[in-house]
């Protein structure tokens, strides 16, 4: 290559390098200007925030207070239902917990210790001298409630009654040593009925017989009062709050869900009670074996659990199973229900 051509080629290369460097310089200068403007905007924002903070009023602090160490007395309420003492549930059939009259006795003992432990825990905070027991029915297990039931009962209802009233009387007698007063309010369930549905009056029921026998057995225990009458419902006053009690077997389910039926029943019962110049705050039932509560217009709708485990009918046909549970809660004169527990009986 001649010298003249080499000079021309070098000139073209230098020109391309110059153009590339000039482009890069413009590019990086553009990035610099963007970052510079961004930094200026951030600094302006910080200055504006500093200016705004000068006009913000200082935060108002609540005065230091000493928490209350003494509170007004509360009363304890125990929901007691759906024992179905004679029911027989076998683990080999359901794959779940066993249940029979001996298991009922063990779970009753568990309930006894749990009630006392919870009472002592809350007595450190407030006075608890009185215990209310809402017996919501299904204490025994009849033989004519559903088809094939006789094969799932361990003993006849008379033997259930004698054994059951002995155990429950001992339970109440033992609790009476720890409370000034125990008030037991009773309604009947459907599993203790005599005959088929609607054949007899509400109180023609083995639950009613057990309740009356408990009155007689415990008549000499001065601080236990058992309230039994022939109605299927009852309203009980606890610390000025009124509790409507019934078993709950006449409440309809929709798609095996009781919530809608309970809401409708509560609304209708409330209208009926007001027509009788009565009123209540809490709607309390058993029967459905699933412990729950939900808010109502004034108080709550509350459903108790069960002593038994899931039986084959409930688990196989209804696809429903619940742990053995009974409800326990405190009631304060000013606020109604305060603390609450689902007492597990299988632990």
Regions found by a protein language model. Give the residues of each.
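Short linear interaction motifs
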Residues: 53-66
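Heptad-repeat positions
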Residues: 7, 11-21, 25, 29-32, ...
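Acidic carboxylate-rich catalytic motifs and surrounding loops in phosphoryl-/glycosyl-chemistry enzymes
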Residues: 182-190, 225-234
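Conserved beta-sheet core of the metallophosphoesterase superfamily
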Residues: 176, 203-232, 238-244, 249-345
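Catalytic phosphate/metal-binding cores of nucleic-acid and nucleotide-processing enzymes, i.e., regions
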Residues: 12, 16, 60, 162, ...
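Short, solvent-exposed loop/turn segments at secondary-structure junctions
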Residues: 84-85, 140-141, 191-193, 250-251, ...
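Core catalytic region of metal-dependent phosphoesterases/phosphodiesterases
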Residues: 28, 35, 64-83, 91-217
């Amino acid at each position: 290559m001649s010298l003249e051509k080499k000079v021309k080629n070098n000139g073209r290369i230098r020109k391309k390098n110059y153009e590339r460097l000039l482009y890069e310089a413009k590019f990086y200068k553009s990035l610099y200007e963007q970052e510079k403007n961004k930094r200026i905007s951030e600094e302006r924002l910080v200055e504006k925030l500093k200016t705004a903070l000068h006009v913000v009023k200082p935060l108002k602090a609540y005065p230091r207070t000493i928490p209350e160490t003494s509170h007004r007395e509360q009363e304890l309420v125990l929901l007691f239902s759906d024992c179905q003492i004679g029911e027989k549930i076998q683990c080999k059939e359901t794959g779940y917990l066993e249940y029979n009259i001996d298991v009922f006795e063990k779970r009753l003992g568990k309930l006894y210790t749990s009630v006392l432990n919870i009472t002592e825990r809350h007595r450190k905070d407030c006075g608890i001298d009185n215990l209310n027991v809402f017996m919501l029915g299904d204490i025994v297990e009849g033989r004519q409630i559903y088809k094939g039931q006789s094969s799932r009962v361990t003993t006849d209802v008379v033997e259930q009654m004698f054994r059951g009233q002995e155990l429950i009387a001992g339970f109440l007698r033992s609790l009476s040593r720890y409370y000034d007063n125990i008030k037991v309010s009773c309604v009947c369930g459907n599993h203790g009925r005599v005959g088929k549905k609607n054949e007899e009056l509400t109180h023609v029921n083995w639950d009613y017989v057990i309740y009356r026998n408990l009155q007689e057995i415990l008549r000499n225990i001065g601080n236990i009062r058992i309230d039994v009458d022939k109605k299927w419902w009852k309203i009980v006053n606890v610390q000025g709050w009124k509790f409507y009690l019934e078993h709950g077997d006449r409440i309809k389910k929709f798609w095996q869900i009781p919530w809608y039926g309970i809401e409708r029943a509560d609304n209708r019962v409330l209208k009926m009670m007001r027509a009788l110049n009565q009123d209540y705050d809490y709607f309390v039932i058993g029967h459905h074996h699933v412990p729950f509560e939900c808010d109502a217009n004034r108080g709550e709708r509350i459903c108790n659990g069960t002593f038994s485990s899931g039986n084959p009918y409930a688990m196989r046909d209804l696809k429903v199973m619940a742990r053995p549970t009974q409800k326990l809660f405190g009631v304060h004169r000013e606020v109604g229900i305060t603390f609450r527990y689902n007492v597990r009986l299988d632990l």
